[in-house]
Design a protein with these regions (language model features):
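Electron-transfer interface patches adjacent to heme c in soluble/periplasmic c-type cytochromes
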Residues: 26-32, 155-167, 206, 211, ...
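Long, charged, low-complexity terminal extensions
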Residues: 38, 43, 74-87, 264, ...
Length: 318
């Protein structure tokens, strides 16, 4: 199942009329009124995917209504789909494998801090199709949960195909989801040794053993894939690894905790806010706004605070 990030289209007739009049009669529709309509429209489409409501169009200051838009179920759906598209770029085989979507929606609907996406005590359970209803998934409490990273559908999705069972895909994906790790894919030449030993040599070390994110070292503290039909996993056995600039990490819980404590996590969250609202990362000239986004997010831990900081900036409606 592919959950896509969709923007709604269309503007109310009243708004179109205001735009039309603004171009023909300044006495009937002042410039600031047209600007208000444009601002209301941009805010509503960006945050909820819907055309602005009559009350938003009538508001003296549309940006003062941002909290109302952030409380709209349409925003929850829109942002959950967006986050899923950013953290799982390929289509999933089942709804439950889009665990990011379901947990993002749960966190937003229940006003949870954003870090619970990654370290909350939850599990994502597949719900089979029944009685004419399509297959879906549920978020349930689980004392052993680690966001969605220990949910079986997600683990299967990123079990990978490394010959010894190291979950390199999961090692990358956990870091990509939390801190926005970006590693370019490399195609090996025929006959290249792709085993753990082979990855220790040449250019392969640059991603797998040497850097901050050392994929092989991270994979060693994750459970291993031991069977393929059905897929099963066994606990890690190779002990703590020194990764993330010299930190000693023993398991996936330690890994997630360290990533969430990093400035990279805050940076990642605010970049998501910019991409969601602007369709692009932050520009260098927006450094002050980006810093405010990070400050507001740090104070509350609520991803809505990051989005509010960006959407409430005067430049958003200019």
């Amino acid at each position: 199942m592919r959950l896509r990030y969709l923007f709604g289209l269309g503007v109310p007739v009243a708004a179109m009329a205001l735009w039309a009049n603004s171009g023909t009669s300044h006495s009937q529709t002042p410039v600031d009124e047209a600007a208000k309509v444009r601002c209301a429209t941009r805010l509503s489409l960006s945050l909820t995917g819907k055309a602005p409501s009559a009350s938003l169009l009538a508001a003296a200051d549309p940006q003062a209504q941002i909290d109302t838009l952030l409380a709209d179920p349409a925003f929850v759906e829109q942002f959950s789909r967006f986050v899923n598209s950013q953290m799982n770029p390929e289509p999933a085989m089942t709804p439950a494998q889009d665990s990011t979507y379901y947990l993002a929606k749960y966190v937003l609907e229940n006003q949870k801090p954003w870090h619970e996406m990654f370290d909350g005590q939850y599990d994502i359970k597949a719900v089979a199709a029944a009685n004419g209803m399509p297959a879906t998934a549920d978020v349930v409490a689980d004392a052993n949960g680690l966001g969605y990273f220990r949910s079986r559908p997600w683990m299967i999705r990123y079990a990978g195909n490394e010959e010894a069972g190291y979950r390199l895909s999961a090692a990358f994906r956990i870091q990509q989801n939390i801190i926005g790790l970006d590693v370019g894919a490399v195609t090996n030449a025929p006959g290249v040794d792709v085993s753990a030993t082979g990855r220790m040599s040449g250019n392969c070390r640059g991603c797998h053993y040497d850097p901050y994110f050392a994929l092989d070292k991270v994979a060693k503290i994750l459970s291993k894939r031991v069977d393929t039909n059905p897929i099963s996993f066994s606990p890690p056995t190779e002990g703590p690894q020194t990764i993330l600039d010299g930190q000693t990490i023993a398991n996936d819980g330690d890994l997630v905790k360290a990533l969430l404590a990093s400035n990279d996590y805050k940076f990642r969250t605010c970049r998501l806010a910019f991409v969601f609202l602007y369709g692009r990362p932050e520009a260098s000239c927006e450094s002050a706004l980006f810093d405010k986004c990070i400050d507001d997010f740090t104070q509350t831990g609520d991803v809505r605070a990051a989005l509010r900081a960006v959407a409430a900036d005067p430049g958003f409606c200019e």
